[in-house]
Amino acid sequence: MTPARRRHDELQKIPGVGPSLAADLRLLGVTCVADLCDRDPEGMYADLEELMGAHVDRCVLYVFRSAVYWAGTSAPDPELSLWWSWKDGGEAERRGLMPQARRAATT
């Protein structure tokens, strides 16, 4: 297996990340799960829209939020490993886990 293929497979171990989102993550410079630790999902989403030159479905932001949580947590909660838990107003927000920038924008 080539190193690029190994990295590709590693990114797809993240819940909710398939081939397309793994490619998006690589566009953002993420080549392994550890690269997601302490990243800003909202910033990643904005950067991806800029790179694509177009609007990107908001569900991608939810996957980025979930992926950053999953990568930076030693024992991720299975419910919080689901991308839809990271939707605006979702379970992660109810638990106070949303990024500060998002919480500030909604208050």
Regions found by a protein language model. Give the residues of each.
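C-terminal extensions
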Residues: 1-15, 19-107
